[in-house]
Amino acid sequence: MNSTGKIRTATLAIGGAALGLLSLTSPAAAATSDAAATQLLTKYNCQACHTVDKKVVGPSYKEVAAKYAGDSTAPAKLEQKVKNGGSGVWGQIPMPPNSVPDADLKTLVEWILALK
């Protein structure tokens, strides 16, 4: 095999290995994120008013994600909304303020905004 063939073979091997690693790590990372979010949603009783895909008292998480899609200020807005509560955005029923630590709040908001 000449040097061009060796380079091509090495490139294909490296590319294949990288794709293999991505296919193994991406689903696991998503599952961990879902598991972490579910644990936090339960811990802070978010499911009393919200679900992933249908309105209960407040909007579904997917509705929130769709409303704020493409809005670079959405994470900060949603973090403040959860902390301080508010009304008028999704109807007349107000969202009460919540005592969620910043790190957990960031995890939840990132998870919600990533929903499709």
What are these regions (language model features)?
Residues M1-A35, K116:
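N-terminal export/targeting leaders of redox proteins
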Residues S26-L41, V56, K67:
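Electrostatic cytochrome c docking/interface patches
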Residues Y44-V52, L108:
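The canonical Cys-X-X-Cys-His
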Residues H50, K83, L113-K116:
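Protein kinase-like catalytic domain
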Residues K54, P75-A76, D102:
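Alpha-helix N-cap/helix-initiation sites
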Residues V57-A66, K81-V109:
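Axial heme c-ligation environment in periplasmic c-type cytochrome domains
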Residues K67-K77:
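Short microdomains enriched in Cys/His and/or Lys/Arg
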